[in-house]
Amino acid sequence: WKDIKSLSKNFRIMSDIVINHASIESKYFKSFIENKTESQNFFIKLKNKQGYDQVVRPRSSDLFREFEINKEIYYLWCTFSHDQVDFNFKNPEVLFFFIKLIHLYLKNGVRVFRLDAIAFLWKEHDTNCLNLPQTHEVVKLMRTLLNAFSKNTLLITETNLPNLENLSYFGENDEANAVYNFALPPLLLWTLVMGDSTALRKWSMSMPPAKDHTSYFNFIASHDGIGLRPTEG
């Protein structure tokens, strides 16, 4: 932390908050599997996996993985892969954990926060578990807390979704300060490959101007590659 504090004097430090899931190798998950009091209900565990056929996720693997906890078998929620299990935000202790974590980062000079895979955060039975109102409320809370600490903070949401869904994370200027502009990379690639900028120009002209204190986070590729879903609309 001494090094981070030193760097923050001359640079704006950005942190990736992996808020949706954790590795099964993490100490938090191992404590959960061992059914320790401080980690009980930290991750989503179910006895019945029926009623989740509508769930939208960018993977074809099974949504659930079986684990034994206290000599009982449970289905654990794995949005992305079976070595990553999703946090249970219906447990207030999980939210408090992340608030404390972000506060620690703030105290040590971090001022920009990227919320990883935030769109999948909240889960409800018989829904698609994507962009749910509760997820937006968590983003609003994070924005409020950051603003209370310092006006020099930024909140960025990573939501690799169709364009209109992505833009919803600006809220009423009370959620993200910036959203990843996920439609740009595939449209730019199409333009270069086809030698035709029509689609790119049409999209750019349709984009609403960013409101005060918000912006689009433009990029041309990421570690996840270039997805096509953001071009759906």
Regions found by a protein language model. Name each.
Residues 1-99, 103, 107, 118-192:
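Acidic/aromatic-lined carbohydrate-recognition and catalytic surfaces
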Residues 113-115:
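Hydrophobic residues within beta-strands of alpha/beta enzymes
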Residues 198-199:
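Catalytic-core regions of glycoside hydrolase
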Residues 203-233:
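Active-site-proximal substrate-binding groove within the catalytic cores of carbohydrate-active enzymes
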